[in-house]
């Protein structure tokens, strides 16, 4: 949640044994060694992105049982529940105090009458009886975001200093047991302001009303974030969730707003992970939040999704007077496999917006079981084309006009990785109109509009699939980044928490140089020794990719050092493993040398691993390309 707060590191007496154990394990293990294991997060219940409603955008801390049950009832009555919207999430503002001396959390009975006899169980029972699930909010630190930035908010926790410490810090097992075993919640959002905003120099701490907690997160500086400490606390949270939910029926939301390089590691610690600061109901904030996730297609998978924040449809630039923008917002979030969490006051939301939330054809793209986030097939400042491969073999394409002038965009078979000489059918998922073309067509896109289509055609790769078509099955277990750097491609909005004070928003979300589909880590076209590759994976040297194989029998690629590399000296060796066994290995390859064809029989292997190894250089100066990397259904070479 709110992320204009400053974090550094937290006292770690309780974490030291865990950190030492983790460090010892890491030191004893070569991160490039094959594991025959899919390492991205698969616990909990998020094989498809979660859908539902959250209280924050509409109400902030001014929440009560009537408002939340009103939203739940509208979700059921409107048919949205039947379409997959099932989580009803209470955000910040519910906690009254931490009772002393037993440290048990108490809700606000004046706002939530059903809690008057000791807790939320009657509330969650009612939601469950409606066929819905219930979510609750907490923070990594002692205190929450509203306490850090809420001013004189009357809805803040009450009582002594200790009673007002309603965050998880020091109470992880107790609180999670309370939330899940005793109160019956299903969804857990964990914010990070409590480990960011309460340093000794904080005005809040200086008042004497809050205890100091040395920060471990800094939104503006990944270098000042203590990433191992944050990861250690999320590990403890995961362990507690598993103990309290032996059936695995939970969903964990990481909300550290893209800070601390979480865009790289969040996929290993939770079901959804925020890639940016909070969204706001302004067009420029949509662009910022979109950009924080749109080039992270290899970092979102079934069970661990990128989260550019909640839908803000229903307010500002996305209200009922801005249906073009509202439809774009919904279409883009669906293509990104973002959680579809509405944030409007659904009791008064116009039917036109309910109809947007309820577009079943677009929901189907978001909930497609293949779990492939859309990949940028065309990437420019004013127009983008995003393509998603579906489990059925169909495609989806979104043509997004970011700007203020209409565009007649060229959509080609190459964008879609379909044959140029065969008919291609487009079904507009808003108008439901069908069109057919061969090779290429024009798509008229109004300002701020997203034209979104389901696509049927003949695959360019008839007997297989390019790895870049199935990012949901490709995990950069080790992406080669050694020094996380802020990503300069994220749009810098003027509508941040400080408005136009200061010098403007600067790049802040680490992830620059991460693995990419159909692109180098730094946004260049894939190319080895002058030969371009329209399909492939770009990643840094000293990296390891995990690939879920399915029933494919062969893998092929052309490998080499990408032409964009600044390191013209050091060699890279490429290896293919199947279930931990070395299947193929290249000769050492340097910049300027032609690509080497590398292939292997992977029939029967569940996990294929692609390793690019080098010594002596700087990974960030040595991007490599797995050109045309594809899984094939035939054991014969293409």
Feature-to-residue mapping (PLM):
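N-terminal module-boundary/linker segments of secreted carbohydrate-active enzymes
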Residues: 28-65, 69, 74, 216-221, ...
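Structural recognition of the beta-strand scaffold that forms the well-ordered cores
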Residues: 49-55, 84-91, 133-138, 186-191, ...
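Aromatic-lined carbohydrate-binding/catalytic grooves of carbohydrate-active enzymes
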Residues: 71-216
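Aromatic-lined carbohydrate-recognition surfaces of secreted/lumenal glycan-active proteins
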Residues: 132-149, 163-164, 226, 230-261
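Glycan-recognition surfaces
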Residues: 242-345, 366, 379
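Carbohydrate-binding surface patches
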Residues: 327, 333-336, 341-343, 379-418
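C-terminal beta-strand-rich structural cap/linker in extracellular carbohydrate-active enzymes
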Residues: 437-461
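Gly-Asp-aromatic-enriched flexible segments
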Residues: 458-638
């Amino acid at each position: 949640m709110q992320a204009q707060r400053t974090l550094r590191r937290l006292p770690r007496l309780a974490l030291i044994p865990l950190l030492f154990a983790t460090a010892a394990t890491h030191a004893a293990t070569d991160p490039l060694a094959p594991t025959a294991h899919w390492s991205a997060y698969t616990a909990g219940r998020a094989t498809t992105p979660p859908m539902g409603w959250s209280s924050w955008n509409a109400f902030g801390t001014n929440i009560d049982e009537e408002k939340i049950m009103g939203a739940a009832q509208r979700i059921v009555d409107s048919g949205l529940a039947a379409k997959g919207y099932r989580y009803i999430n209470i955000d910040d503002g519910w906690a009254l105090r931490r009772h002393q001396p037993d440290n048990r959390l108490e809700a606000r009975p004046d706002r939530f009458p059903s809690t008057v006899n000791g807790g939320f169980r009657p509330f969650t029972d009612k939601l469950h009886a409606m066929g819905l699930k219930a979510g609750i909010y907490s923070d990594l630190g002692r205190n929450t975001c509203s306490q850090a930035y809420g001013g004189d908010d009357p809805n803040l926790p009450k009582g002594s200093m200790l009673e007002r410490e309603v965050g998880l810090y020091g109470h992880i097992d107790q609180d999670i047991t309370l939330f899940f075993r005793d109160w019956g919640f299903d969804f857990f959002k964990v914010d990070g302001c409590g480990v960011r905003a309460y340093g000794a120099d904080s005005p809040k701490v200086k008042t004497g009303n809050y205890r100091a907690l040395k920060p471990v997160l800094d939104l503006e500086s990944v270098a000042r974030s203590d990433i191992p400490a944050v990861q250690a606390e999320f590990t403890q949270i995961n362990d507690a969730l598993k103990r309290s939910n032996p059936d695995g029926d939970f969903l964990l939301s990481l909300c550290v707003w893209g800070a601390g390089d979480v865009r790289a590691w969040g996929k290993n610690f939770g079901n959804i992970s925020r890639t940016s600061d909070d969204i706001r109901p302004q067009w420029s904030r949509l662009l910022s939040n979109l950009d924080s996730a749109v080039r992270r297609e290899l970092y979102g998978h079934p069970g661990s999704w990128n989260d550019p924040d909640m839908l803000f449809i229903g307010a500002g630039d996305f209200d009922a007077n801005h249906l073009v923008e509202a439809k774009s917002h919904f279409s883009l979030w669906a293509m990104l496999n973002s959680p579809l969490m509405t944030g409007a006051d659904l009791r008064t939301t116009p039917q036109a917006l309910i109809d947007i939330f309820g577009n079943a054809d677009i929901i189907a793209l978001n909930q497609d079981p293949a779990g492939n986030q859309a990949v940028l097939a065309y990437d420019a400042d004013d127009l983008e084309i995003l393509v998603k491969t579906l489990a059925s073999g169909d495609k989806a394409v979104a043509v997004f006009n970011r700007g203020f002038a209409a565009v007649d965009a060229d959509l080609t078979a190459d964008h879609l990785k379909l044959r140029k000489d065969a008919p291609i059918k487009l079904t507009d998922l808003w108008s439901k109109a069908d069109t057919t073309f061969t090779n290429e067509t024009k798509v008229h896109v109004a300002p701020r509009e997203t034209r979104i289509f389901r696509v049927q055609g003949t695959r360019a790769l008839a007997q297989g699939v390019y790895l870049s078509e199935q990012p949901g099955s490709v995990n950069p277990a080790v992406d080669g980044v050694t020094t996380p750097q802020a990503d300069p491609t994220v749009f810098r909005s003027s509508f941040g928490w400080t408005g136009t004070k200061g010098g403007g928003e600067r790049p802040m979300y680490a992830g620059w140089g991460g693995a990419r589909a159909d692109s180098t880590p730094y946004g260049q076209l894939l190319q080895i020794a002058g030969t371009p590759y329209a399909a492939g994976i770009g990643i840094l040297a000293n990296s390891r990719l995990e690939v879920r194989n399915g029933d494919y029998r062969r893998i092929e690629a052309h490998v080499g050092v990408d032409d964009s590399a600044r390191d013209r000296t050091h060699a890279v060796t490429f290896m293919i493993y199947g279930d931990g066994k070395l299947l193929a290995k290249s000769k050492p390859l340097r910049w300027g040398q032609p690509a080497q064809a590398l292939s292997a029989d992977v029939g029967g292997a569940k996990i294929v691993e692609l390793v690019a190894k080098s010594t002596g250089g700087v990974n960030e100066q040595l991007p490599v390309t797995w050109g045309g990397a594809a899984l094939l259904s035939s054991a014969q070479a293409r």
